[in-house]
Amino acid sequence: MMKEMRKKPHVLIVEARFYEKISDALLKGAVSALQKAEASYDTITVPGALEIPAAIAFAEQNKISYDGYVALGCVIRGETYHFEIVANDSCRALMDLTVHKRLAIGNGILTVENEEQAWERAKQDDKNKGGFAAEAALCMIALKKRFGDNR
């Protein structure tokens, strides 16, 4: 079906699996929000948060056309500077895709101090950041269409 004929958004969820159980919780929230909106979706996985922007860029070049993207993952501070690199660079790369490629992306990459904070944000019955990221993507898809980018 051609994208222009679709009434409901078609979304790609890109899920980093570095913290698998936390990622599973984020995914449940995102899927629930997309199903509630009657959006169709595909899901792919990548090793970690740094790979999410590249996966979205690859998908954008694919024959399958997505209206928007949901980025899901978790970065927990450790003892080295690696946390700052992953947190900052994954977010910056997503913003670059959003601004320069005009992609509708909901950012659900958690950047937290510890696993307890991650669970608080990942669980559907708590902060539900996976669901929030999906809702943000849907909002940006609608905004993009409002301004005439029906690509």
Swiss-Prot record:
InterPro entries: LS, LS/RS, LS/RS_sf. Keywords: Riboflavin biosynthesis, Transferase. Its EC number is 2.5.1.78. The active site is at 82 (proton donor). Pathway: Cofactor biosynthesis; riboflavin biosynthesis; riboflavin from 2-hydroxy-3-oxobutyl phosphate and 5-amino-6-(D-ribitylamino)uracil: step 1/2. One of its GO terms (biological process) is riboflavin biosynthetic process. This is 6,7-dimethyl-8-ribityllumazine synthase. It comes from Bartonella tribocorum (strain CIP 105476 / IBS 506).
